[in-house]
Amino acid sequence: MTTTDRIAAAFARVSEAGRAAALIPYIAAGDPSPQATVPLMHALVRAGADLVELGVPFSDPMADGPVVQRAAERAIAQGVGLRRVLELVADFRRDDSVTPVVLMGYANPIERMGQRAFAQAAQAAGVDGVLVVDYPPEEVDEFAAMLAEAGVAPIFLLAPTSTEARIEAIGRVARGYVYYVSLKGVTGAGSLDTDDVARKLALIRRHVHIPVGVGFGIRDAASAQRIAAHADAVVIGSKLIETMEQAGAQAGADQKNEAAIAAAQQWLHTIRLALDDVKRENAPA
């Protein structure tokens, strides 16, 4: 199965099961440690993740709130950069050839590696999609083409401030799914206005004909359910990382990885159970 096929297949499985939305957890590669990342990814899949977003640590993460920033800092302190992230994806692929993995990060590490070299390395590692926070869609046609040539989906962010023209532009180049940022500001901030999200998704779907995931501000089962009633995927990052952070802080020095992984799996499973109660419209009973 090729990389872009894995994303489509994941959303197809969700639909065939009658579920309203896919569950996409976000973690920072290398947090709580490089050794924990691959076991953590497998634990998230066991908990019910349909796709996994893997953050590439960067020293100036302008779109990330304090929780995700701390995770990136911990990873960088342990020597995790883009090349190590690709190695971790390849390690994950040895035991899981089904679950899509999407890298989320910033342009600088990709530019240092070279766009074409990165696209080829991502494909070789088993990456399914790439979301670069600070690449505007009107400037990335060449990079998107390189990714597509390598079978990797270029994924883009949309925000409450996105104009219809920008939505239309992204609809032309995005593959896999698009990620709607439900709040203004950084990750982990604010509270959700579900009605506003629903209105914006209706506008997005006029121009975007692939699944639309929603993230930012989803912190518990109730908010996940509200978003799942409207979105094709629910993306959860800050609260998941915070849950691991707290579990690790309470564990002994030699048990921090295990405690963080167990807490993540348990917490994400509660979200998956909540999402399973939200059924897709016209789904079989």
UniProtKB/Swiss-Prot annotation:
Keywords: Amino-acid biosynthesis, Aromatic amino acid biosynthesis, Lyase, Tryptophan biosynthesis. Pathway: Amino-acid biosynthesis; L-tryptophan biosynthesis; L-tryptophan from chorismate: step 5/5. Disulfide bonds: none annotated. Tetramer of two alpha and two beta chains. This is Tryptophan synthase alpha chain. HAMAP family: Trp_synth_alpha. The active site is at 53 (proton acceptor), 64 (proton acceptor). Pfam families: Trp_syntA (PF00290). Belongs to the TrpA family. Its EC number is 4.2.1.20. GO terms for cellular component: cytosol. The keyword Ribonucleoprotein does not apply. The alpha subunit is responsible for the aldol cleavage of indoleglycerol phosphate to indole and glyceraldehyde 3-phosphate. One of its GO terms (molecular function) is tryptophan synthase activity. PROSITE patterns: TRP_SYNTHASE_ALPHA. It catalyses: (1S,2R)-1-C-(indol-3-yl)glycerol 3-phosphate + L-serine = D-glyceraldehyde 3-phosphate + L-tryptophan + H2O. The keyword Zinc does not apply. Signal peptide: none annotated. PANTHER family: TRYPTOPHAN SYNTHASE ALPHA CHAIN, CHLOROPLASTIC (PTHR43406:SF1), TRYPTOPHAN SYNTHASE, ALPHA CHAIN (PTHR43406).
